[in-house]
Regions:
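Substrate-binding pocket helix/loop in short-chain dehydrogenase/reductase
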Residues: 72-74, 78-86, 179, 183
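Short C-terminal tail/terminal secondary-structure segment
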Residues: 122, 203, 214-227
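A glycine/serine/threonine-rich, flexible loop-to-helix segment
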Residues: 150, 162-186
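Alpha-helical segment proximal to the catalytic Tyr-Lys
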Residues: 102, 146-147, 211
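Canonical Rossmann dinucleotide-binding motif of NAD(H)/NADP(H)-dependent dehydrogenases/reductases
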Residues: 2-36
Length: 227
């Protein structure tokens, strides 16, 4: 029997080759979604609107934004590092929403899910730039969601860390004994959340069964974010 959890939904996933993109595309399609995988860079101010226009009708937008995380101490962060990180992670988000939200409001139906980071919820050394950018995403979600909810459009975010993905936790990082020791010591789950586990949760949030969530930020980090 075919899986119809997301049947009939057109879901646009940005940066589909990065971060959670590959697994999201696979899992959401398995659940019956018509997946539109965008691989364009979104740093050009005109790119987000162009991507949304090219996609046609979008029932669900998954803002899957990623950039290699800088590991600079706060005292040494350059203006270039700060600006380029925000240009990749923060600036495209309101541009995407501006492009996709009007049609959702008109239809009185839609979902926007931001694939964020738990570094916005709990600090880590040498992640001040990255954590600040991810926190800006969450701040935007919290306010924009309140405005969209009155039109039956839900905006939420997954704040993840220690989840399998090719951008931040590639296989070569996972194989390092030092990293494995860190996981056992610092992450209550004792392992990485699998990419599929994360994507299955995203699929639920995109479904009609999750229509009650407004401006929610869901930590998916093996217990690390709540310690």
């Amino acid at each position: 029997m075919p899986d119809t959890l997301l049947g009939g939904l057109r879901i646009l996933i940005t940066q589909a080759d990065d971060f959670m993109g590959p697994t999201l595309c696979e899992v959401l399609a398995e659940h019956g979604a018509d997946v539109i995988a965008s691989r364009e860079s979104l740093t050009d101010p005109t790119a987000p609107a162009a991507v949304v226009t090219a996609a046609g009708r979008v029932d669900v937008l998954i803002a899957n934004l990623a950039v290699p995380a800088p590991s600079t101490e706060a005292v040494s962060i350059s203006d270039d590092e700060w600006r380029s990180t925000f240009a990749a992670l923060v600036d495209p988000l309101p541009r995407l929403v501006r492009a996709v939200l009007p049609s959702m409001i008109e239809r009185k139906s839609g979902r926007i899910l931001v694939m964020g980071s738990a570094t916005a919820l709990r600090g880590m050394r040498r992640t001040a730039t990255y954590g600040a950018a991810r926190a800006a995403q969450i701040g935007y979600v919290l306010s924009a969601a309140l405005e969209a909810a009155q039109h039956n459009v839900q905006i939420n975010a997954i704040a993840q860390n220690f989840v399998e993905n090719p951008t931040y936790y590639p296989v070569e990082v996972q194989a390092k004994p030092r990293f494995q020791e860190f996981m056992k010591r610092e992450v209550p789950l004792g392992r990485l959340v699998s990419a599929r586990e994360d994507a299955e949760f995203a699929a639920y949030l995109c479904s009609k069964a999750a229509a009650c969530f407004v401006g929610q930020v869901f930590p998916v980090a093996g217990g690390w974010a709540i310690r």
